[in-house]
Design a protein with these regions (language model features):
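Bacterial N-terminal signal peptides that target proteins for export
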Residues: 1-11
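Bacterial N-terminal signal peptides
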Residues: 11-20
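Boundary at the C-terminal end of the N-terminal hydrophobic targeting segment
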Residues: 21-25, 29
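Short amphipathic alpha-helical segments that mediate assembly, nucleic-acid/protein binding
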Residues: 28, 35, 48, 133-134
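Non-catalytic all-alpha helical scaffold/repeat segments
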Residues: 36-47, 82-91
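Extracellular ectodomain segments of secreted/surface proteins
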Residues: 45-57
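Aromatic-lined, polymer-binding surfaces characteristic
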Residues: 54-222
Length: 222
């Protein structure tokens, strides 16, 4: 009996050592090349024609996700092709939205503003913004502003994060006081509960990530 217990202990110790080795390897692993390869695979069929088509189809979520994702990949890899992609998508969107602001609204566009603002910020840091972008950005934010959209899920938090970023980018915008008021309302609505109410893992992670970014980017944490 003692021998069996001793063997079990050795097996457990061995298993823990193996897990520890794999955990250390996981911590040292560089996932960026794999992420870049996956992004390249997903965007291999993107083109100027496709971009304009999606903008005119009011696929605001697709357009803003692509411009921000490519900008983030540039920031992570410093590969110029990602910055070029972000500039191309952003520039086309600004041009088309300027001609027809009805194209600024589309399905699930509650995701749009925070991605648009993120792309703007990275392009601004690299002197890649097109002429007239500021006016379109502010108009886009105003058209998506809904002070009564107070809800504790990823849709509400995505909107709030977008307005946090707009407040930081355009502190002198005419509607900035209303944007800030909305952000504070959303923050306090969530803070009373201090929980993520989403049941789906993906949406829960989006919600939690937004809460962290709102707290950091609006100086709600020291």
């Amino acid at each position: 009996m003692k021998v069996m217990k001793l063997k079990s202990c050795f097996w457990l110790i061995g298993l823990l050592l193996v897990c520890n080795v794999y955990a250390q390897e996981l911590c040292r692993a560089d996932f960026l090349p794999k992420a870049s390869a996956a992004f390249d695979l997903l965007t291999q069929k993107y083109s100027e024609e496709r971009i304009v088509k999606e903008i005119r189809a009011k696929n605001v979520r697709w357009v803003t996700n692509l411009m921000s994702a490519s900008a983030v990949f540039y920031k992570a890899t410093h590969e110029k092709r990602y910055l070029d992609m972000s500039e191309q998508v952003f520039g086309n969107a600004i041009r088309e939205w300027k001609k027809n602001e009805k194209l600024m609204h589309g399905k699930d566009d509650f995701f749009a503003l925070q991605n648009l603002a993120l792309a703007y910020e990275i392009l601004q840091d690299n002197d890649r913004l097109p002429m007239g972008a500021d006016e379109v950005m502010i108009r886009f934010a105003d058209l998506h502003f809904d002070p009564d959209f107070v809800i504790d899920n990823n849709q509400g938090q995505e909107r709030a994060l977008g307005f946090v970023r707009m407040c930081n980018l355009f502190p002198d915008a005419p509607g900035v006081s209303h944007w800030k008021e909305y952000v504070d309302k959303m923050w306090h609505f969530w803070y009373r509960n201090k929980d993520v109410d989403e049941t789906a893992t993906l949406y829960a992670s989006i919600h939690l990530n937004d809460i962290i970014n709102i707290a950091i980017e609006s100086d709600k944490v020291a």
